[in-house]
UniProtKB/Swiss-Prot annotation:
Domain of life: Eukaryota
Name of the protein: Large ribosomal subunit protein uL6m
Keywords: Mitochondrion, Ribonucleoprotein, Ribosomal protein, RNA-binding, rRNA-binding, Transit peptide
Localisation: Mitochondrion
Listed InterPro entries: Ribosomal_uL6-like, Ribosomal_uL6-like_a/b-dom_sf, Ribosomal_uL6_a/b-dom, Ribosomal_uL6_bac-type, Ribosomal_uL6_CS
Miscellaneous note of the record: Present with 5700 molecules/cell in log phase SD medium.
Primary residence: mitochondrion
């Protein structure tokens, strides 16, 4: 590994540990708990291994979410001030520091998810391009120029709305699930660089290319 690569890695780990050390603020309507897994497992990556032995659960008005975490992560609750600190056993260990910021971000996303929810907005750009809900909102029919019927079943925990034929709103507690479903719908027609037709997610933009003239 070169000096520059080591430098970039150390900066990335430092930033992640900075994120990990930030407190999480929770409202009285949110409950965060950590419990031992009944069936812990070992995950190996290269020469390192992690014992996934705990489950963090976040409950709120909009639902309940959980994330499985390694044994070296802990939660320090400060109920008086309504905050939680995520800590690790050894903040000097690069693998623990890397997971520190990642898990803290996941928990924060879950807290937002069970209180406010997460959104993804899809825009359909192109003549006749649109989305339509069928089967009482359980199926998204996508029309993007294909002659055959295309679409996806709406996963459990996801709500889809169509404020306009060319717009789709995906809502859910789990941010990863919301973005994954949006990405799957986008695959039916990713934005193309010549006319700009396609399915755009959130603030996505593309740079149009000039057509090659033979």
């Amino acid at each position: 590994m070169s000096f520059i690569q080591r430098r970039l890695l150390s900066q990335t780990l430092f930033l992640r540990s900075q994120v990990g050390s930030l407190p999480l603020y929770i409202s009285p309507e949110v409950q965060v708990s950590i419990n031992a897994l009944s069936m812990p497992r070992i995950i190996r990556k290269g020469r390192t291994s992690m014992n996934i032995s705990q489950n963090i659960t976040v409950k709120g008005p909009k639902g309940e979410l959980s994330v499985e975490v390694p044994d070296f992560l802990h939660l320090d609750k400060d109920e008086k001030h309504g905050k939680i600190n995520v800590t690790v056993q050894n903040s000097e260990d690069k693998h623990q520091r890397s997971m520190w910021g990642t898990v803290r971000s996941l928990i924060n996303n879950h807290i937002i998810g069970v209180t406010e929810g997460h959104l993804a907005v899809l825009r359909f750009v192109g003549t006749g391009y649109r989305a339509q809900l069928e089967n009482d909102g359980k199926f998204v029919n996508v029309k993007v120029g294909a002659s055959i019927k295309q679409g996806l079943d709406v996963p459990e925990g996801i709500v889809v709305k169509t404020p306009a034929p060319t717009s789709l709103i995906i809502e859910g507690c789990n941010k990863q699930q919301v973005l994954l479903f949006a990405a799957k719908l986008r695959k039916f027609h990713p934005p193309e660089p010549y006319k700009g037709k396609g399915i755009y997610v959130n603030d996505e933009t593309i740079k149009l290319k000039d057509k090659k003239i033979k």
